[in-house]
């Protein structure tokens, strides 16, 4: 017996699909969750008069632009003018503050390859001028965010050829400082900065 719809067409059951489509993994926004949390936190700090900290823009030289419409421009070719230093800088309690923010899905360590030579040189110069310099590291698997002084990262970077190519999570647990995640501010890293650099 054929089952029919009210319009007379026969019912056709949906075919069971045996092929499972894998979702494409998008790596384009790695680090953007931490970055957006820090941007939101910095906005909170600025609004409440706690600190003036901003994300540094990456210097880009635009070479080729296409104008498909009058109101829209599409950048077709661009180059970095110079290597960028760290992600954020500003002033807090009369001291210069400079830091990098990085995220990893790795469960046991933080890869040193996420840093570049010019960033290490910049961090050394900030520390030499008695500035506050650190790295905020988020282990996304554990939803844990740490503040780690730049001196530890520089030391690990300088020994990466002879020793490890990563900083073990156990090292970050010992020498880093866990940052409490909340609502406002989202990533209250200044609370940790107070404890580490002003106590």
Curated annotation (Swiss-Prot):
Its EC number is 3.1.21.10. It catalyses: Endonucleolytic cleavage at a junction such as a reciprocal single-stranded crossover between two homologous DNA duplexes (Holliday junction). One of its GO terms (cellular component) is cytoplasm. Residues 1-24 are annotated as: Disordered. It comes from the Bacteria. Its main location: cytoplasm. The record marks 102 as: Transition state stabilizer. Mg(2+) binds at residues 85, 87, 100, 119. One of its GO terms (biological process) is chromosome segregation. Its cofactor is Mg(2+). Keywords: Cytoplasm, DNA damage, DNA recombination, DNA repair, Endonuclease, Hydrolase, Magnesium, Metal-binding, Nuclease. This is Holliday junction resolvase RecU. It comes from Halalkalibacterium halodurans (strain ATCC BAA-125 / DSM 18197 / FERM 7344 / JCM 9153 / C-125) (Bacillus halodurans). The gene is recU.
